């Protein structure tokens, strides 16, 4: 799923963390099959959001460099280990 932000030249995409790297960097495989190098956003760092390989995340990519991104959200899993589906209406 691709989201476009209006205020910046940013593309949001969903993916899965494949590998944890030093300095809070992660290799993320996007839903379209591409792998990108992503770092954790400042708010996630500040709130001590832990990321491990296998987590579903939302990554922001700039239109200028599609090989690097910023992880802005970790998807929540329900009790069965499946991704919760959130309605846009709520």
From Swiss-Prot:
GO terms for cellular component: cytosol. This is Translation initiation factor IF-1. Residues 7-76 form the S1-like domain. Signal peptide: none annotated. It comes from Fervidobacterium nodosum (strain ATCC 35602 / DSM 5306 / Rt17-B1). It is found in: Cytoplasm. Belongs to the IF-1 family. Keywords: Cytoplasm, Initiation factor, Protein biosynthesis, RNA-binding, rRNA-binding. PROSITE patterns: S1_IF1_TYPE. The gene is infA.
